Design a protein with these regions (language model features):
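Conserved Radical SAM active-site core
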Residues: 4-7, 11, 23-24, 30, ...
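A short beta-strand-turn-helix
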Residues: 13-17
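Histidine (H) residue identity feature
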Residues: 19, 48-50, 150, 193
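A generic structural micro-feature
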Residues: 19-21, 128
């Protein structure tokens, strides 16, 4: 696939997960059929509302940022064959990460696989073996048990993160803090970009 539907691309700071605080060039691919009710980028769901962009243009824009770390996100980016995009970025010496629900097998050899499963659509089995990072959004206290079910299936060295659903942050974050203190293999992911008021 030489073109992809792109909602936006921008240079910022990665705000969450293992790479928090790093300068990062984001490529947000449009299109998602997972349907998280609390999604903060619902405008990314409809691919046909966004411009089809040449992969070569995406690679050039990432190069122009002079950032050697690209995050491919969505939407659900794994809906598409990302081989040409990932290979093209890596050929330029750019480290590539993806943020995915794991609902689709990934086409492309990614450097960092952030797996954030959702209850609305079950992930495929390969997501558990590929995951470098498991990030669970905590929306309700019952989600802690759900997080543990997924943690049992990932690799032993997979980084484990719990992140509060943003609209419930004040209520949920204290519960996450207590949980991580009692279960220290988990770490807290804060959406620090929202505190910094950056994209």
């Amino acid at each position: 696939m030489n073109i992809l539907p792109i909602m936006e691309k921008f240079f910022t700071i990665q705000g969450e997960g293992s790479h928090t605080g790093k300068a990062a060039y984001f490529i947000r691919i449009a299109g998602c059929d997972v349907g998280c009710v609390w999604c903060d980028v619902k405008e990314s769901w409809e691919r046909h509302e966004h411009q089809e962009t040449e992969i070569s243009e995406l690679i050039e824009s990432a190069k122009a940022s002079k950032c050697n770390f690209v995050v491919i996100t969505g939407g659900e980016p794994a809906m598409y064959d990302l081989t040409l995009l990932i290979d093209g970025l890596k050929a330029e010496g750019i480290y590539c990460a993806i943020e995915t629900s794991g609902c689709y097998p990934l086409k492309g050899s990614i450097d960092w696989y952030c797996f954030s499963p959702k209850k609305f659509k079950l992930p495929c089995e390969e997501a558990y073996t590929k995951a470098d990072e498991l990030k669970i959004i905590i929306n309700h206290p019952s989600d802690f048990a759900w997080a543990e079910e997924h943690a049992k299936k990932v690799k032993e060295d997979c980084a484990l993160f719990l992140q509060a659903e943003w609209s419930k942050n004040e209520k949920i974050l204290p519960q996450i803090i207590d949980y991580v203190k009692s279960n220290p293999r988990w770490r807290i992911s804060l959406q620090t970009h929202k505190y910094m008021q950056i994209p």
